[in-house]
Amino acid sequence: MTESNFRPKILIFAAEMAYRAADAAGLTKAEYPSNTYYIRIPCSSLIRPDLILYAFKKGFDGVLVASSGDDCPFMGEACIEKTSKRAEKAYELLEQNGIERERFKVAGICSTCVEALRKQIQDLNETLQSLGPIKTA
């Protein structure tokens, strides 16, 4: 595939509330890039850094963790701190493996934040377009 017709694949780990926004986006037929794949998770703080790296090694060009933030029904406000710590470890792991940190993003998305989710996906998609295909071993 040439870089001119590059269409990045984005994996979204969507926590409980953020997944509701994704579901609402589908129900309202909100437009966003169709090159996204969702994995529903109970809480963003459960995502291990090695799973982020694994997604890249399996061919994804970008990963978005859509967190419920302090709306998390499982951890409440503690979700933000734990997710942030895991994200920092993921950034370190990506750097050690030669993967640009711009390919990984964490965002707090509430259950009714369809537009915020769409914008996060669009922004990541544009970043990935400018970076081009991922180069992993």
Predicted segments with their positions:
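Iron-sulfur-associated redox domains of electron-transfer enzymes in respiratory
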Residues: 1-137
